[in-house]
UniProtKB/Swiss-Prot annotation:
Species of the source: Ostreid herpesvirus 1 (isolate France)
Name this protein carries in UniProt: Putative RING finger protein ORF96
Record's keyword annotation contains Zinc-finger: yes
PROSITE patterns the UniProt entry points to: ZF_RING_2 (PS50089)
Residues in RING-type zinc fingers: 9-44, 150-202
Length: 240
């Protein structure tokens, strides 16, 4: 059969693997760990859905009979005894559904946060750090400078109020969810001094202007980069 079975989750090595990945149909992660992977740990295929194994019904190929996945023990249809060449999920409890691109965007945001935190801590004792960062930008960051879409998640920003950040250095716009994620990480790491560079283009230039939660144009002091926006974030979460 198409499944890759394991007696324990290949990620945490503790829980039993109770979910099935779509479309590869591999069975090697517990439900908790399945939310932290974007590719199947066994075949590296992009995951588009995660199902509870016990609930899954599949249509076998080529006979097209529908059977419960947990009842399949060999590469033969239990109804017609014909050899199976594949299977497709037709029913089951879907625990998660996503596009692989969403996970790549999340990874991109996570990398930006890590780089910002690392640079903020290293700024005082590594003078060559900024040059290395500026010229070591991954190519994935290029060609995404659009005022109507977030440069991190690439989702369209339909309302002006959603343009939380607009960087004068590169005109890049970051949507409110991505901006909040960056700020939340900075607050958790207790980094409240100026950020060392623009989160998008890595230019060593503070944000010149931005929009607050009400969509009003802001004019922070020219050297207020992180401190200003961390305070804005704290106001935002305190008002929720």
């Amino acid at each position: 059969m198409a499944n890759y079975d394991s007696n324990e989750c290949v990620v945490c090595m503790e829980e039993k693997p109770l979910v099935v990945f779509e479309p590869c149909m591999h069975h090697n992660c517990c439900e908790s760990c399945s939310g932290h992977v974007s590719n199947c740990p066994y075949c590296r295929a992009d995951i588009t859905g995660v199902y509870l194994e016990a609930s899954v019904k599949v249509k076998l190929e080529p006979c097209e009979h529908i059977v419960k996945l947990i009842k399949i023990t060999e590469k033969k249809c239990s109804t017609c005894d014909q050899d199976t060449t594949g299977m497709v999920i037709v029913d089951g409890k879907l625990t998660k559904t996503f596009k692989a691109e969403n996970y790549r965007n999340a990874a991109r945001l996570k990398n930006i946060i890590a780089m910002l935190i690392k640079a903020a801590k290293a700024r005082n004792n590594r003078p060559g750090f900024f040059r290395k960062m500026k010229f070591g930008i991954p190519s994935v960051f290029t060609n995404y400078i659009h005022l109507d879409s977030c440069v991190i998640c690439k989702k369209e920003i339909k309302e002006e109020v959603g343009k939380t950040y607009m960087h004068a250095c590169c005109t890049a716009t970051i949507c409110k969810p991505c901006a909040k994620a960056i700020l939340k990480a900075m607050v958790e790491k207790e980094i409240t001094e100026n950020l060392p560079f623009c989160p998008y283009c890595f230019t060593k230039t503070p944000i010149k202007y931005g929009l607050n939660a009400e969509g009003e144009l802001l004019d922070p002091p020219s050297d207020s980069f992180s401190y200003y926006y961390v305070n804005e974030y704290m106001k935002m979460i305190n008002n929720q």
